[in-house]
């Protein structure tokens, strides 16, 4: 007889109800909970999944390359990137009538197509690709790589090729490998591509497989490198009248420090980018030789952490007022981190989340791809995309931090160290965060509501408008002169300015920072920015409060002292202990996700509206309407959704109709979430039992039976399903809104 799902949990496989299916899906990737799982097997399985993960990414990128080469207009687009709209792929749908077929036959295509808002065209163009054949070759190469990755994943699960537990826990070797090989060498390799292929192509010099060994990337070749005359590589950069992709204004420099933007492509100088990657690569290769491994030289992480202990009896930090000795503040930290995958994953997710949010900001403030800064819809889509991903990663960091406290934390090993002290002082941490959120919330909302009232009563001059003087000062210190704050780089005679002016060569940072359009990397800010900044701060601090409380209370609280024994996720256990709903560490993640979505919406609303106003030459709209809530609702949300609610109507359709339909459907998905979030298990169990009764008494329905007794989702599962609908609906609705409202104005 076939083994029932899930094979990894025989106890669950014997469950006679539909709970078997849902719990099986929920725990499929919780390898720690599987039958017969050892620590070594756990590490080996996770290692193998990395290859699968990389294979999925490779397939995804190959799919983009293949479909754009097959159905896109890449070769036409590169001839005029500013005016030809890039095509993502063709679309065919049996529901299409003549109206929508005509509306979506766009961008020079002969049949319905989707416009690309991914920025892939700009990326491939910038790195030197020019033909569909190159895109096809890239797709084929990646598919071959995917096959190798899948084979490698399978191979590393075979007994002879499974790495040992000691190999996984050799932190120093792992750090050296990741720093020097993965980060360092890949950065150097990317520098090589930029220098040998991308920079020559940007100067009208084709470099391909046919001539890459015979075309020198610099007239002097490697001579300046070996003679230590490295400055030669920075001499003769492209001129300010350089035309991207042609020899007009082209120089010979390959590593520069120009700053600012290429005037025609309005992107960072490729030679600056190459210099950046070279420096990053060298730094990481040095960093990858710092930790003790094969040769017995270098640091060990255990020594580094324990060197931070304050054992000196004269150290004021050593002894607390009550006489307790605090000198062992890092004892056990290395073992704790090195033996906890959840701790390591939490650190990785937090780091990657912060980096992803930084990418969102920098793709707009410091655009690195040629002409992408003028593709406003793509810029809006990429900002939104990266901020939403950053939100997920950062919430996940706290979630795995909480799982660490439940599953991996050892009180004896960590006695008296910083981890133990964080747990001891959690009430102070949580209550301070609570105080901060209340201060931010009451003050920010109070000012917004005050402004709404006075505007509604016809006295807009009575609004409370606070200039963000400290933020303006930071912009001025960095060189922005419009505020009249004469300090540092905004003062022509300051030591900072004189030092900057003494650097050899030309530099264009000040030109960029004082531009009058959206391409200045510091946009002018005023009272509307001040208010929304504090609204976002409220959202960030509230999200952090819920997540930090969830993690610090994950082992136990005054309400549930033995909470760790219940695991990471557990349902309410009724009124017996004063009601325990919303107290598991998983519930903290669940609750925080709503605040995280709230916050990320405010962040992307702010970025999008401010940029729309600048792009349309109507900066006053944001500055004047952004100081009260009705201004946001009326002049951003309502005004910009007009394109969406007119994508299709009784008089016909236009190219925005698919986004209009997605906008509507996104609202439906979002609203469906509340069905799971508001009505709980008992209602559904009673309904299911009634439906089963009706089914069994309907002769034709009895042709279909089931092995598992139908039961309602658990409270935790229903919350997950509800949150998923809420989140996906949020994405679909706002994604459609951003793309349609921006492309409806700018194409």
Swiss-Prot record:
It is a multi-pass membrane protein. [4Fe-4S] cluster binds at residues 572, 581. Divinyl chlorophyll a B1 binds at residue 667. Phylloquinone binds at residue 684. InterPro entries: PSI_PsaA/B, PSI_PsaA/B_CS, PSI_PsaA/B_sf, PSI_PsaB. SUPFAM superfamilies: Photosystem I subunits PsaA/PsaB (SSF81558). GO terms for molecular function: 4 iron, 4 sulfur cluster binding; chlorophyll binding; electron transfer activity; magnesium ion binding; oxidoreductase activity. One of its GO terms (biological process) is photosynthesis. PROSITE patterns: PHOTOSYSTEM_I_PSAAB (PS00419). Keywords: 4Fe-4S, Chlorophyll, Chromophore, Electron transport, Iron, Iron-sulfur, Magnesium, Membrane, Metal-binding, Oxidoreductase, Photosynthesis, Photosystem I, Thylakoid, Transmembrane, Transmembrane helix, Transport. The chain crosses the membrane at residues 46-69, 135-158, 175-199, 273-291, 341-364, 380-406, 428-450, 530-548, 588-609, 656-678, 720-740. PSI electron transfer chain: 5 divinyl chlorophyll a, 1 divinyl chlorophyll a', 2 phylloquinones and 3 4Fe-4S clusters. PSI core antenna: 90 divinyl chlorophyll a, 22 carotenoids, 3 phospholipids and 1 galactolipid. P700 is a divinyl chlorophyll a/divinyl chlorophyll a' dimer, A0 is one or more divinyl chlorophyll a, A1 is one or both phylloquinones and FX is a shared 4Fe-4S iron-sulfur center. Belongs to the PsaA/PsaB family. NCBIfam families: psaB. PsaA and PsaB bind P700, the primary electron donor of photosystem I (PSI), as well as the electron acceptors A0, A1 and FX. PSI is a plastocyanin/cytochrome c6-ferredoxin oxidoreductase, converting photonic excitation into a charge separation, which transfers an electron from the donor P700 chlorophyll pair to the spectroscopically characterized acceptors A0, A1, FX, FA and FB in turn. Oxidized P700 is reduced on the lumenal side of the thylakoid membrane by plastocyanin or cytochrome c6. PANTHER family: OUTER MEMBRANE PROTEIN, OMPA-RELATED, PHOTOSYSTEM I P700 CHLOROPHYLL A APOPROTEIN A1-RELATED. This is Photosystem I P700 chlorophyll a apoprotein A2. It comes from Prochlorococcus marinus (strain SARG / CCMP1375 / SS120). The gene is psaB.
